[in-house]
């Protein structure tokens, strides 16, 4: 019988079990330094561990300009680790003032499994010609949900400032 790591982690969390993931002498194994940067130490005599244990979290409040990427880097976590822990539907959408529980010092940060591929199409085939903005929407998130590029959505909406979207605002969708 096989279980995913999330099943094991959820079971451990429900029983308040702290499973060691790595110890201070263990180094994270990565396949690509660019995809999974490993934490670095300052060269101090007693460097901090490169990995924490299950249950090591930091509560943080999202500030203006922060993304899951910047938060993950700050706490040596992964974008998808944070998204999973906080049950985020879209890791590209977080809000100023939102409180997140961040797993810290993760041995093998997951920065890819929860990401939806960015659309490459320039128009939606047979789709609706308009879209009504909802709370949390950004041009990036709307374009991603439609499977089109942000540039094509921006091009279909001259005069609309993407940073100033309002709830219930109607924008154009490029239709093929």
UniProtKB/Swiss-Prot annotation:
Residues 31-50 are annotated as: Disordered. Keywords: Glycoprotein, Repeat, Secreted, Signal, Virulence. Residues 1-18 form the signal peptide. InterPro entries: LysM_dom, LysM_dom_sf. One of its GO terms (cellular component) is extracellular region. Residues 58-102, 129-173 form the LysM domain. In plants, chitin acts as a microbe-associated molecular pattern (MAMP) that is recognized by lysin motif (LysM)-containing plant cell surface-localized pattern recognition receptors (PRRs) that activate a plethora of downstream immune responses. This is Secreted LysM effector ELP2. The lineage of its organism: Eukaryota, Fungi, Dikarya, Ascomycota, Pezizomycotina.
């Amino acid at each position: 019988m096989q279980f995913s790591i999330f099943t094991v982690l959820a079971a451990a969390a429900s029983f308040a079990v702290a499973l060691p993931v790595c110890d201070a002498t263990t180094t994270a194994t990565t396949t690509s330094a660019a995809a999974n940067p490993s934490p670095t130490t300052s060269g101090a005599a007693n460097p901090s561990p490169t990995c924490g244990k299950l249950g090591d979290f930091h509560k943080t409040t999202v500030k203006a300009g922060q993304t899951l990427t910047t938060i993950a880097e700050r706490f040596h976590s992964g974008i998808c680790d944070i998204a999973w822990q906080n049950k985020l539907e879209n890791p590209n959408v977080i809000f100023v003032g939102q409180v997140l529980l961040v797993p810290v010092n993760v041995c093998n940060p997951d920065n890819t499994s929860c990401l939806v591929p960015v659309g490459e199409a320039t128009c939606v085939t047979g789709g609706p010609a308009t879209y009504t903005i909802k709370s949390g929407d950004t041009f990036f998130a709307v374009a991603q949900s439609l499977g089109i590029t942000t540039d094509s959505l921006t091009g279909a909406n001259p005069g609309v400032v993407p940073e100033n979207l309002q709830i219930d605002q109607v924008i154009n969708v490029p239709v093929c």
